[in-house]
């Protein structure tokens, strides 16, 4: 019986490892991006802190922006915008619910390669109770903080796709630089009037 339990446990581990399952909130950051520079206009702002935290959770070593190393990829955080749209109204016409939309733009600079723009968009709804103004403000602050965290997660999840695009770009460059024999000019087969 013990042998059967060990066999089933081993089989379960192999199946989950083989299908690519991984723990929540972790991303397989490419090995070429395990050391990175985080560049932001507001290094102590909420987005910078959230991105820095996500990078560290995923095992990325962060270097100082003023480092002399030029062979390290750089994640540059750009503009953050938060929009608030009315989602529903009370009978008297006052806003009952808002939909908050956070848009974050960033670029990844890979030395010797290209600059890859990435963006993240996070949506959250927020109920507006006019009778609880203080609680409403606190709830909105908590929602915005959570939106920064989700946007940071989305940005980090896009790093593997940037690496794949970089590899494709390198392959296209090598295929265009190889010598190919000249092909005959295209001949039109239509009859002119």
From Swiss-Prot:
One Pfam family this sequence matches: LptE
Disulfide bonds: none
Membrane topology: Lipid-anchor
GO cellular component terms, A-Z: cell outer membrane; transporter complex
Signal peptide range: 1-18
Location(s) in or outside the cell: Cell outer membrane
Skewed-composition ranges (Low complexity): 174-186
GO process annotations (BP): Gram-negative-bacterium-type cell outer membrane assembly; lipopolysaccharide transport
Keywords (A to Z) from UniProt: Cell outer membrane, Lipoprotein, Membrane, Palmitate, Signal
Span list, region Disordered: 166-193
Lipidation (N-palmitoyl cysteine): 19
Keyword check for Membrane: yes
TM region(s), chain numbering: none
Main location: membrane
Domain of life where this protein originates: Bacteria
Gene Ontology molecular function, alphabetical: lipopolysaccharide binding
Lipidation residue positions, type S-diacylglycerol cysteine: 19
Function comment: Together with LptD, is involved in the assembly of lipopolysaccharide (LPS) at the surface of the outer membrane. Required for the proper assembly of LptD. Binds LPS and may serve as the LPS recognition site at the outer membrane.
Subunit composition and interactions: Component of the lipopolysaccharide transport and assembly complex. Interacts with LptD.
Similarity remark: Belongs to the LptE lipoprotein family.
Protein name: LPS-assembly lipoprotein LptE
Lineage, broadest ranks: Bacteria, Pseudomonadati, Pseudomonadota, Gammaproteobacteria, Enterobacterales
